Amino acid sequence: MLLFLLSALVLLTQSLGYLEADMKTYSQRTAPSACTLVMCSSVESGLPGRDGRDGREGPRGEKGDPGLPGAAGKAGMPGEAGPVGPKGDNGSIGEPGPKGDTGPSGPPGPPGVPGPAGREGPLGKQGNIGPQGKPGPKGEAGPKGEVGAPGMQGSAGARGPAGPKGDRGVPGERGAPGNAGAAGSAGVMGPQGSPGARGPPGLKGDKGVPGDKGAKGESGLPDVASLRQQVEALQKQVQHLQAAFSQYKKVELFPNGQSVGEKIFKTAGFVKPFTEAQLVCTQAGGQLASPRSAAENAALQQLVIAQNEAAFLSMTDSKMEGKFTYPTGESLVYSNWAPGEPNDDGGSEDCVEIFTNGKWNDRACGEKRLVVCEF
């Protein structure tokens, strides 16, 4: 029974819901009014009933006409880049841009074809002495040269054995009487001498036995004078030999040398300024090299080549510019200047040097050059 009542109530409720839905649908389609919503007959028919409950929501109506477009919203965030599209057509050529910076230098190109030879330039100054080259192969023997000039007198040799007695010489001139010597001890009686000067007559004696005739004696005074002259000559020779030997010892301090004629050029291989070089040679009993002929210049050149150093000569023009003289003041009797020399370059070249090619050049005296002395 109770179940029946509940079922009826549910059905009634559903009926009211459908009715309400129909009314809402109708109200949306027609203009609502107080009469249509509340009353179905005139007011005079009776009192209005109580408001019923809202019915169930009716079915969804048809889609209405589109409304007016709303205002544009704000731009959203940019999306991700899309895929690259196909290449477009080439645009028109633009105006040239500003000049760019200079790029790095490229690698050097191959050498070009040699150009034609230029004109020969002027002759340059003589360069410095180069290093001594290696000795070349030994050449063939040349023709025999001329006999050279006699060399200097050599030092005295050792005393030889006594030679055989020579022939009697011619009596010399009478010398001055010498001083009386001290009386010597009595010697063995010699042979009878020649008769002395006649003495004063004595008392007449008894006649004696005649003696044997003695040999004729030699004259004394001429022989003494000759011996004195010989001794003096020997003393001079000894003095000359002593001086020569003393100079020879000094010369031997210079190990390298060349002789020509009566001259010897010597060097010890060291270099000095002109004034000091001059002093070294003077103390050794000589002077700086002073070649007075082509032969002497060639001999000096051999020393310069062996040492591979230019050497000072003794000549200067310190007294008169351009006029070179020997240390004695004499003018030059021989010269072998290089082309364009002397030129007094810099206004201070008052001394002379000799190169390995034998040519001369004026040089400042303060420079250091090889010391070569002449004896």
Swiss-Prot record:
Annotated Low complexity bias: 116-132, 138-150, 173-189
The protein's name in its UniProt record: Pulmonary surfactant-associated protein D
Annotated disulfide bonds: 281-373, 351-365
Principal subcellular localization: secreted
Gene: SFTPD
Assembly and oligomerization: Oligomeric complex of 4 set of homotrimers.
CDD domains: CLECT_collectin_like
Entry keyword set: Calcium, Coiled coil, Collagen, Disulfide bond, Extracellular matrix, Gaseous exchange, Glycoprotein, Hydroxylation, Immunity, Innate immunity, Lectin, Repeat, S-nitrosylation, Secreted, Signal, Surface film
PROSITE patterns (UniProt xref): C_TYPE_LECTIN_1, C_TYPE_LECTIN_2
Function according to Swiss-Prot or TrEMBL: Contributes to the lung's defense against inhaled microorganisms, organic antigens and toxins. Interacts with compounds such as bacterial lipopolysaccharides, oligosaccharides and fatty acids and modulates leukocyte action in immune response. May participate in the extracellular reorganization or turnover of pulmonary surfactant. Binds strongly maltose residues and to a lesser extent other alpha-glucosyl moieties.
